[in-house]
């Protein structure tokens, strides 16, 4: 074993015109969450507990697309989703259609620990949350002024805004200047919210992963993306822990997170090789990114977009927070 390691993400694919202050806000939040996880890992907190702890922090801050600050549905409401997985015995929990639970990642954890099921959704998940006594808030708590403005403009453009920030061309040349939609005089993509995730391997070599999101801006009611789908947006095994972000439908088709573990197990690839392989061969024309840790203490961030909000740290003192390639 190579010691503990942790990685966090706040979405893949970033507008090259993103203002410096927005970049700095994202870096500060990722740094704060990394440090929270590092302190816990140094105190021998388990991988699964660290994943939940860090994602709760991300859900509480409105900067990214999870918990407070989640993307809005076509009706202006929030329907959140999250999943968490413990690689030790491949235990998992997931939730979708969450409208009043302050921290969806903790409800996903309770589904794993306190229910006979792996996945609960909509009214059933909300009923379970109340029986478990989790913190409940009004749906309005999750709605921010920025997202209200984004939804209005998305409706005017008759479009759905994806949870990545650049047009499908995926290069700096296809920057926000190509978008006709603006808010406050700036390209709409500057305000686009992003999915969050965390992966951890603890000092015992146990891997865990979690992902949380509000989904797509102006999405249809009832839409479910990759984030709560075990094997697509989230996966953990005895080999690794993986959390994905980007074009949800492409990630679902690729079962991207599970594939990292599969090629490690069946092809004998190391973590870097496995991440490179799935990013290159499994996404077709989709754009996505992922963070991953291995049971050997390795940490890798991979993406085929121009950037990804990300941060990682290892027990030997390495720490990095970055956005661009």
From Swiss-Prot:
It comes from the Eukaryota. The record marks 194-195 as: Cleavage. Cleaved into an alpha and beta chain by autocatalysis; this activates the enzyme. The N-terminal residue of the beta subunit is responsible for the nucleophile hydrolase activity. Its EC number is 3.4.19.5. It holds the Pfam family Asparaginase_2. Acts in asparagine catabolism and also in the final steps of protein degradation via hydrolysis of a range of isoaspartyl dipeptides. The active site is at 195 (nucleophile). GO terms for biological process: proteolysis. It catalyses: Cleavage of a beta-linked Asp residue from the N-terminus of a polypeptide. Belongs to the Ntn-hydrolase family. It is an enzyme of class 3 (hydrolase). This is Probable isoaspartyl peptidase/L-asparaginase 2. InterPro entries: Ntn_hydrolases_N (IPR029055), Peptidase_T2 (IPR000246). GO terms for molecular function: asparaginase activity; beta-aspartyl-peptidase activity. Keywords: Autocatalytic cleavage, Hydrolase, Protease. The lineage of its organism: Eukaryota, Viridiplantae, Streptophyta, Embryophyta, Tracheophyta. Substrate binds at residues 223-226, 245-248.
